[in-house]
């Protein structure tokens, strides 16, 4: 969920902007030798992958712990509390990790960035691997922080595992996951990536004389600044939708760790295929509507 264009590596800074008497000037840095430059790029990638692992761990743990706490208290699931905790956690984590890894914490989001060529396949595979490790670690920590048996003689991980409703067929659940993931990824691509000219710092108003249609748009920088809030709100309201049908995952990392640790693989494949399909369609759809699309 990057707040900037998701290139394979950050470009190295070529100069340092320094203020001298109110004027800004560039001071050239000594070029790095090829080995040093390669090492720096490698470290940036390693840091990004580790950041994605930690970000996913925190996100999945918050969601699972919220559900586990309700179950231990004997309270029925509360979609409002679940939506708020999901949204707030997403906002905090995106602000915290956006400049480290891009804060995807969702294999479907990473897949969409790969198929739209915002992320390389190699980096995407490393991200997905890190996300799955983070998901498993979150489920293991959940067992340590919520001990004892849950209803149905389940452990904490299996108790909060997401699965389709028993009264919904596979088509209902598949389509629900696809649509919810499409909404999420479309919003992420629309607000988190540079879709307009960043050199435009102010709002642009265009008016068509033929039909009196006024179009308002904002700069990429303005949109990116509010991206964590927009994404958090989207995750929050999506929690109110589809939970009674598919379980409302729209994130394969949310279901993988609990499925592995809790040994609950009910229709697990659906959350990968439906979510990846919805994410890919959303990425291409947003690219089509983007102002930079040629």
From Swiss-Prot:
This is Aquaporin-B. It comes from the Eukaryota. PROSITE patterns: MIP (PS00221). One of its GO terms (biological process) is cell motility. Residues 22-31 have a biased composition (Basic and acidic residues). Putatively gated water-specific channel, requiring a cysteine residue within the channel. Impermeable to water, glycerol and urea when expressed in Xenopus oocytes. Not regulated by pH; channels remain impermeable to water at pH 7.4 and 5.2. The keyword Transmembrane helix applies. Belongs to the MIP/aquaporin (TC 1.A.8) family. Residues 1-42, 101-123, 194-224, 290-294 are cytoplasmic. Residues 1-31 are annotated as: Disordered. A motif (NPA 1) lies at residues 106-108. Gene3D superfamilies: Glycerol uptake facilitator protein. Keywords: Cell membrane, Cytoplasmic vesicle, Glycoprotein, Membrane, Phosphoprotein, Repeat, Transmembrane, Transmembrane helix, Transport. It comes from Dictyostelium discoideum. A motif (NPA 2) lies at residues 251-253. Glycans are attached at residue 75. GO terms for molecular function: water channel activity. Residues 64-79, 145-172, 246-268 are extracellular. Induction: Inhibited by mercuric chloride. Glycosylated and non-glycosylated forms exist throughout all developmental stages. The chain crosses the membrane at residues 43-63, 80-100, 124-144, 173-193, 225-245, 269-289. It holds the Pfam family MIP. Aquaporins contain two tandem repeats each containing three membrane-spanning domains and a pore-forming loop with the signature motif Asn-Pro-Ala (NPA). The keyword Acetylation does not apply. Residues 208-219 are annotated as: Required for water permeability. It is found in: Cell membrane; Cytoplasmic vesicle. GO terms for cellular component: cytoplasmic vesicle; membrane; plasma membrane.
């Amino acid at each position: 969920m990057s707040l900037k264009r998701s290139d394979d590596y950050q470009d190295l800074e070529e100069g340092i902007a320094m203020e001298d008497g109110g004027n800004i000037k560039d001071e050239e840095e000594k070029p790095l030798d090829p080995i040093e430059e390669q090492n720096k790029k490698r470290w940036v990638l390693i840091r990004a992958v580790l950041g994605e692992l930690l970000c996913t761990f925190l996100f999945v743990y918050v969601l699972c712990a919220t559900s586990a706490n309700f179950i231990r208290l004997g309270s029925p699931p509360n979609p409002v509390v679940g939506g708020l905790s999901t949204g707030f956690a997403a906002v905090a984590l995106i602000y915290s990790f956006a400049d480290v890894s891009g804060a995807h914490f969702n294999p479907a989001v990473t897949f969409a960035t790969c198929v739209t060529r915002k992320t390389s396949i190699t980096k995407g595979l490393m991200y997905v691997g890190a996300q799955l490790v983070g998901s498993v670690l979150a489920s293991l920590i959940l067992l340590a922080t919520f001990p004892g048996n849950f209803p149905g003689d389940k452990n904490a991980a299996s108790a909060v595992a997401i699965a389709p409703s028993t009264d919904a067929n596979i088509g209902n659940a598949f389509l629900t996951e696809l649509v919810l993931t499409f909404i999420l990824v479309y919003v992420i691509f629309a607000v988190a990536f540079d879709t307009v000219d960043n050199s435009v710092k102010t709002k642009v108003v265009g008016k068509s004389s033929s039909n009196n249609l006024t179009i308002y748009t904002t700069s990429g920088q303005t949109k990116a600044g509010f991206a964590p809030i927009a994404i958090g709100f989207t995750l929050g309201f999506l929690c109110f939708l589809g939970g009674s049908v598919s379980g409302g995952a729209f994130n394969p990392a949310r279901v993988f760790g609990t499925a592995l640790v809790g040994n609950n693989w009910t229709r697990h494949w659906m959350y990968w295929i439906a979510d990846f399909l919805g994410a890919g369609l959303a990425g291409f759809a947003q690219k089509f509507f983007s102002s930079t699309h040629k």
